Regions:
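Terminal intrinsically disordered/low-complexity segments used for targeting and assembly
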Residues: 2-56, 111, 135, 219-265, ...
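Hydrophobic alpha-helical structural elements of bacterial secretion/transport assemblies
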Residues: 47, 51, 55-87, 104-112, ...
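Short strand-turn segments of transmembrane beta-barrel domains in outer membranes
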Residues: 90-92, 300
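Residues on the lipid-exposed face of transmembrane beta-strands in outer-membrane beta-barrel proteins
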Residues: 92, 115-119, 323-327
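Gram-negative outer-membrane beta-barrel proteins
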Residues: 94-100, 123-125, 305-309
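Long hydrophobic segments that form regular secondary structure
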Residues: 272-292
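Short, contiguous acidic/charged loop-to-helix segments that flank catalytic cores in large enzymes
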Residues: 308-316, 328-330
Length: 330
């Protein structure tokens, strides 16, 4: 009965018009929330090793995982009031009753060993809605970690391919420079033998200079991509080993796909936005339930005795039950 009574709206996912079918590349299908099978797409062993290091050491991803652990703890805390709490207490006290207040002027000892039970009757769904919001926040944190992982994999791959491209361009430029140096020497020899004028020699020098001036720019670009890649890996700046050219890199022939509705569910930004709506919807229920009286059932049961040696005797049994009502006024 209590489980079915909770004020506030229940979340309902809006209907979306989606096609029934969509092209799927065999062997690369994904399930909802599963980390993409990136090794099936990025097959370069060097790139795979970099991605694994990034997934382990990236600082932004580590922060997202910390927020996930925080959300897990918050859900545990939010669910705790849904169940009775049971504690054990033992103690003793000595009291002197004044004759001026009707006492007998004697000292009295009392020893107790009690079990303490407390349970809030969640009639209006205050605690259930709060746990519902915490569960949505936890799932949102899980999808945020997933989003960081997917984004990190893509960023590492992009930086790696940029680095491969720059290295390939630098290698090609160095070859071009070497070729033009040879061409300049030939032109100089031809000029010395009177076969050509100095104009052709000057043109060869200009051509060589144009090739040589590209090298510092390419080296600077390589340094930028290396530092960018190291930052993604959570490491200090240093050189990065890559494949020599794109011809050495094996690529997959297709990309993961699926039903359009599944694709939406796998998009972290869409899932995080929806879960934010779920949490906000549950918080509406929390706010509404907080307007109603809150009932708490408490009880104490155990033994009490004036003599410590008699504390566990059956005649010392004692209990008390209390129903408390609290009504917010403002």
């Amino acid at each position: 009965l209590l489980a079915g009574c909770a004020v506030g709206p229940d979340y309902e996912r809006p209907d979306l018009a989606m096609p029934d079918t969509h092209r799927v590349e065999p062997g690369l299908e994904l399930t909802t929330g599963e980390l993409p099978k990136w090794k099936a797409v990025f097959r370069d062993p060097l790139l795979q090793a970099l991605i694994e290091r990034g997934l382990e050491n990236n600082l932004d991803l580590a922060a997202a995982r910390s927020r996930l652990r925080e959300a897990e703890a918050e859900l545990t805390r939010a669910r705790a009031p849904l169940y009775p709490s049971l504690d054990v207490a033992a103690g003793g006290e000595r009291e002197y009753e004044s004759e001026l207040t009707g006492g007998d002027g004697e000292t009295a000892d009392t020893y107790s060993f009690l079990g303490l039970l407390s349970w809030e009757l969640d009639i209006w769904g205050f605690n259930r809605r709060r746990a519902e919001a915490a569960a949505a926040d936890l799932e949102s944190a899980q999808w945020s970690v997933y989003a960081r992982q997917v984004s990190l994999i893509g960023a590492i791959a992009a930086s790696y391919f940029n680095l491969v491209a720059v290295n390939e361009q630098l290698s090609l430029t160095n070859s071009t420079v070497a070729t033009r140096i040879q061409a300049l020497r030939i032109q100089e020899l031809r000029n010395q033998s009177g076969m050509i004028s100095g104009l052709e020699v000057a043109q060869a020098k200009v051509s060589l200079a144009e090739a040589e001036k590209q090298i510092p720019t390419l080296k600077n670009s390589r340094l930028v991509f290396e530092n960018q890649l190291r930052r993604l890996l959570g490491e200090m700046p240093a050189s990065v080993n890559t494949s020599r050219s794109f011809e050495d890199i094996p690529f997959a022939t297709g990309l993961p796909a699926g039903l359009p509705s599944d694709l939406l569910e796998r998009r972290p930004d869409v899932r995080v936005a929806e879960l934010g709506l779920v949490a906000a919807n549950a918080e509406v229920g929390v706010a509404k339930a907080d307007l109603f009286p809150r009932l708490t059932l408490t009880g104490e049961f155990g033994t009490e005795s004036a003599d410590l040696s008699d504390l566990l005797d059956s005649g010392g049994r004692a209990w008390v039950a209390t129903l408390g009502v609290a009504q917010p006024l403002f």
